[in-house]
Amino acid sequence: MISNFNLKPADKKSIQILQFYRPVCPCYTYSTIMPPKKRPKLLIFDGNALIHRSFHALPITMKTGKGEVVNAVYGFTSFILRAIKEFKPEMVALALDMKGPTFRHEAYKDYKGTRVKAAPELYAQIPRAREIAEILDIPVFQISGCEADDVIGTIVTKMKDKAENIIVTGDMNTLQLVNPHIKVYTMSRGLNDSIIYDEAQVVNKYGLKPNQIVEFKALRGDPSDNIPGVKGIGEKTAVELLQEFTTVKNVYKNINSDKIKPRIKELLESHHQDALMSHDLATIRCDIKFPFDEKLLQFGGFDREKATTLFNELEFKSLLPRLIQTGVADKKAAALLATARAEDKFTRNTSEFSYHTITTEKDFNTFLKKLKTQTRLAFDTETSGLDALTSSLLGISISWKKNEAYFLSIRQSSLHSQKGGNDLFNWKATDSKDTLHPWLIALKPVLENKAIKKIAHNAKFDIKILEQFNIKIAGLDFDTMIAAYILNPGSRQYSLDTLALRWLNFEKISGEDLLGGGKGKLSYSAVPVEKLGIYACEDADVTFQLWSKLEPELKKSNLKKILDTIEIPLIDCLIDMELAGISLNAPYLKKLEKELDIKIASIQKEAWKICKKDFNLSSPKQLQEVLFTDLKISSAGLSKTKTGISTGADELLKLKGQHAIIDLILEYRELTKLASTYVRTLPELINPVTGRIHTSFNQTIAATGRLSSVDPNLQNIPIRTELGRKIRAAFIAKKGCELVSFDYSQLELRIAAHIADDPMLKKAFKEGQDVHSTTASLINHVPLDKVTADMRRQAKTINFGILYGQGPHGLAQTADISYKEAQTFIDEYFAAYKNIKKYVDETITKGKETGYVETLFGRKRYLEELNASNAMIRKSAERMAVNTPIQGTEADMIKLAMIEVHTFIQKNYSDKISLLLQVHDELVFEVDPTIIKEITPKIKKIMENVIKLSVPITVDAKRGENWVGMKTI
């Protein structure tokens, strides 16, 4: 029906090809890309839709240091990289609208006439989006007189028999193109969620087949494009008509049918021409004439150096790691390209890099002479593995000048394996020439010299390695990984490779470049020393260069003090904690595992009995069927995923009380999760040499500044459930010692009282009242002595819920009360604690103005999402803004307490006390029982006075043989 537009024949150039651009990458041969057998994937991006969606999803405050707004182009780039990673296409294309009227405007002058002109900040980013596409070697199509949808329709039609076509877009216009070989991949919420539409998914969402989408718009219209449709016919009626008659043509053919109500018949007859015109306007044209060669679509080799330069210019530092991972789809071609690029890194221009691998005594002596004159150096260790307790040392690299570094090839096994003993931590008499490599002995005075400032990346690992050889690094001044984290705590991308790209615009030799991949992957020990030397020198060189970039940034942002006074001093404490480890009662856990297996099996049988059939309680798909089909439980208010209604724990909590099976499933999930994560796994983590578990503490994971731990994750062992307490009971003191716990009392609430300067909350703490009972009394308007246990429980939930930025919805779920009750409690809470309300409002307002929130110590968390137009994203950022100053201050206090207590122990009780664990507000020590009474008040005093607040800080102390069976001291 396109003929209704009276377009001139295409060969007379009524539709002109105004722009087509295909960048050519000289480093890649396109003919190697196409797999010969299976259909290749073609990703075709709807540029304008992605740009518009991104602009409205991300805050307009996303700007470069030069003030260029980049929110739309950032979202556009992020979604393109995500789609490429997910689908690994062999072919790609980008379609953009051309400025000016289209054939649809000629047919209907009011086409898109109701659209409000977009902000100039959006239009300014379109050339940047095109630049991104070109730098990624994606061909760009813009055709005069047509929309991007028509270009997409034409290309996928040409390729429907040759490729699996995936249209990547931000709207639903292209759903009409879906068929067995054409799918649509679109954002479903903001930029974080996506969904792929095949024929079944379109029918599931709209109740119509893809080819009926045009028919639907012809009847219903499309307000976003000002397509009129049939006035008076809504979505429901349009769907019903099409389900009965399939097409608009058939609707009119059967206009006198009894199945069409008189009122609807009248509307259809009155607006017949509007329906036909709307049909034409909504139809994506699939026969645009323009020169087309499918070889131009082939994707693979783009110039990463140029791409990295552009990403750095736009300050897309968080996207750089994804850029590294974006490559060609064909495995053989990818392998060839990767090998060639890896070799090129090892043979970079030697005039630029002065890298030296030292293997002879003569060269070492020359190097050592230079080394002793330095006042600052970067160092890095190369090891046989990533476990600092068991790995052998392969060498040390050192740099003190840009593009210059030295690698000392030292093949040294750890001393405990040489001695054949099992005491990893008693090597003070082993630094002799009989046990240590002579170069290590020569390096020891330099590395232990405080006057020579040291720089490292993830210094904790390198220091732990060197401690195996009784080399104790002194003068550690800078850790590039931690510095990058302090500058951008929300990134979670702090590898040396990533930081080199972000800050130096330099692509490092990666671990894969060095070791290879697949079955032929080498171990570090097997890498030729020449290659290992280049790799190691580069690590030290990059670390040194990063220091020169990151230190000024820390100073400019007034964050250097966080590094100097908290994070760097904490490293020694964490190393001692990790090396100390903690004992585990493995037989007890084995017994607990058997009990759990019986309980889990019992729950499973009970669930099967209720449903009258066997099913897998861990399968989301089977749960969906059982809950919503078999048992007909209402799914109203539950989130949806790509596979249907979500059966995640948070969603199932919304169904609590609706059916007996919900509680069973929740209990089953908790038991199976804790069984697999802790009960079965913990014994496997026992170090065979020490007989203890050695967790690793992370300083660069939590955006608030909190520490986290892995292998095992101690922070996630629940304390309030019976099973959680049973798991904690497995952590025990070694023979002849006891565990002593020092736990801050309600620290977050005390910090909140101080920061908000709330008189009622401060009064409660100063008078030693139970703050939860006080809150219960205030919000329920009853005397303290009339507060019930249930009132206190709800008040406790509210006290902490407010600190975590919870609204009535969240509070209703956590407190197990109605939305109305939750809103009433929040109103009463803010009426009682007026300054807490003031703190919440002012913190959010200030965060929107500055782009960040900060702790009492000045640690910053950047939250640009506070200005997001998407309400869900914005509300989430507001919750983070409210919580971060409190939780972040708490984290800083705990870290300072650890530093001071560790120093106190080292000076006075190093052979009788070991700090083992830090979990939230609690520190756990292993102590000689004879000194517990002596040291308890001293450690409490240190912890309670690490900072002065306007309310008292109190610490509770307990002792016992395991982590749970403790008694108050």
For each predicted feature, which ranges?
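Cysteine-centered motifs
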Residues: C25-C27
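Noncatalytic, basic helical substrate-engagement surface that gates or grips nucleic-acid strands
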Residues: P35-V168, M172-E199, D274-M277, T283-P291, ...
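Charged catalytic and DNA/RNA-contacting regions of genome-maintenance
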Residues: P36-P40, I166-V168, T174-N211, K401-E404, ...
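Conserved RNase H-like, two-metal-ion catalytic cores of nucleic-acid enzymes
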Residues: K41-L43, G47, R53-M91, K109-E121, ...
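Conserved "right-hand" nucleotidyltransferase catalytic core of DNA-directed polymerases
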Residues: H271-T430, P438, S491, W503, ...
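C-terminal polymerase-core module
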Residues: I598-K605, K609-D663, A831-R879, N883-P885, ...
